[in-house]
Every structure is written in C-alpha cells, then in structure tokens.
Amino acid sequence: MSEQEPSSADLAAREAEEKQRKAAEEAEQATLPYKWTQTIRDVDVTIPVSANLKGRDLDVVLKKDSIKVKVKGENGEVFIDGQFPHPIKPSESSWTLETTSKPPGKEVSIHLDKVNQMEWWAHVVTTAPKIDVSKITPENSSLSDLDGETRAMVEKMMYDQRQKEMGAPTSDEQRKMDILKKFQKEHPEMDFSNAKIG
C-alpha cells in the first residue's frame, strides 16, 4: 500500500499554518525583556540596559539551575529571574556589559554552557513562553564542530523529530519494518494477517 503525496492545497495549508505558528512564536518572544539564541552546546542571552549602568550596578547570578539579572538595590529592575529548563555549567558560563550603537546604549551579554550538549532548550527560564524546538535547524558549521559519532547521533535525532512531526516512522521504526518485510518475503508460507506489530 503506497501513501499518496500531499496535494498542493495541503502543502499550501501546512505552509500557511507554519507561518502563522512562527509569527505567533516570534511575537511571544518579542515581549521578553531579553533576546536569546542557542546552539546545541550553549545559550546566549542579551539584555538591553540603560547606558548609564555600570557592571558594579548589576546583580548577575548564574547558578547550575537558575539565573537572576537585576539592578542592585531593594527596588532594582529585574530583567530575568527564574529556573533553567536544563542545568548549565556555571564555571564555564559568563556575562559582560557591552556598549552598543543602538538605544538604550548598553547590553548585558550572557553566555551559558549547557550540561547536556545534546538537547535544545524551549526557553531560557521555565516561566517564559516556549519555542518549538522541533523546528530548529542547526547551522552546518555547528554540526561540523561535532565529532563523527556525535554528529551522526544529532542528525538521526533531527531526522526522527521531523519524521514524528509528519506522522511518519522514525529511523528505528523504519528499520524494524524493513526487517519484518524481509522476513515475510523470506517466509511466504507464514501467515502474518493476525500479527500484532508495535
């Protein structure tokens, strides 16, 4: 039994749905007081701050499972305060205060090293809106940084994620189906009509 290719109307509907989802996700992320990006190994956060702030005016705390960035003082503005979705390596993580050419004039740049360098984060802190990590396509340069075995595992994970998303079998499921088909071909005398597979 062969599966039909999706019609152009189906593809157009999926594409429109995806654009709408992406626009909603971007709108949610735009409301955050910071911007963030990630690779499979780390997360970078930038927080625009007032040009008159100095490093000593800031209270930046990076722990294994949480982050807090605020202006010092009892009523100091809090930029981010919450739990990470996954642990970081505090000793490998850092922050700097940098001058920028665009207003408000400075930004806090935070670099977080992930403990598990094989997973994507859906958000920086668990109270923030999530992004759809299944839509992340890492740059080839970051994949090429990985050793052969790790790269193969990441590519397999990405393939399996896309397959699940489309309702198609993962690489492991496909391999099992291929083995079963081969076995059925080699043993036509066996009746598989009542077999429960899965």
From Swiss-Prot:
Keywords: Cell cycle, Cell division, Cytoplasm, Cytoskeleton, Karyogamy, Microtubule, Mitosis, Phosphoprotein. It is found in: Cytoplasm, Cytoskeleton. This is Nuclear movement protein nudC. The gene is nudC. CDD domains: p23_NUDC_like (cd06467). One of its GO terms (molecular function) is unfolded protein binding. It comes from Emericella nidulans (strain FGSC A4 / ATCC 38163 / CBS 112.46 / NRRL 194 / M139) (Aspergillus nidulans). GO terms for biological process: cell division; fungal-type cell wall organization; karyogamy; nuclear migration along microtubule; protein folding. Residues 29-125 form the CS domain.
